[in-house]
Amino acid sequence: MELTLHEARVIGCLLEKEITTPEQYPLSLNALTLACNQKTSREPVLDLSEAQVQDALDSLTKKRLISEQSGFGSRVVKYKHRFCNTEFSELQLSPAAVAIVCLLLLRGPQTPGELRTRSNRLHEFKDVIEVEDCIKQLISRTKPILKQLPREPGRRESRYVELFSETSANVVTTSDHTDKLHTAPVAALVEHGALVARVTELEQQVATLTQKFDELIASLT
C-alpha cells in the first residue's frame, strides 16, 4: 500500500486513539480532524480542514483501510481503521509493532531511543534493546514494513522509517542518494590512491631497468 501524507496521518491517528482513548474510539470526523492537527506528537504539524480529512477518509475507504460506523439513533458517522489486526486486514502486528508503526506514521523517521521514549502511552518497552528487536522483526518480514536509514553525522543511532507512505518513500530515496554521494568520493579516493601506487611502482621498475642497461653498456665498452 502507498499512503499520502494525509492518509498516513489519518491512519496513525486512528491507531493512536484506539489505544490511548478507547472510550472515544471510533472517531467522528471532527475528533479525527483535531487529532490530525495536534500540535504535539506530530511531525510535521498539519492544519487540515474537515474537507481534507474527509477526502483522505474517502480514499482510504476505497483502499479498504477504513470502515464507517454509525451509532444506534445517532446521525454522526464514526470511523475506524482496517489497517491491521482486524478480520479484514492482511497485516497482523504485535502490540509492540503497532506502537512503532503508529509513531513512525505520526512523526516520521526516528531512532530506537526516540521510539522508546515516545511510546509510553502506546506500549511499554522494557528497554531500547526490546525496541531494536521488534524493529528487526519488522524489517525481516517477507515483505518488510520498515527500513533503516543511513546514520547521519553526529548521531549515535540510525533512524528507521515505515514503508507505507509516499512521504517515507521520498525519505528513503533521498537518504539513498545522499549515501551514494558520500560513498562516491571515498571510492574515487581509494581508486586514485591505487593508481598513484601503481605509477610509483612502474617508475621504480623503469629506473632499475635503466640503471642495469647503463651498467651493461659500460661493461661492453
From Swiss-Prot:
InterPro entries: DUF480, WH-like_DNA-bd_sf, WH_DNA-bd_sf
Sequence similarity: Belongs to the UPF0502 family.
Protein name: UPF0502 protein Sputw3181_2381
Taxonomic source organism: Shewanella sp. (strain W3-18-1)
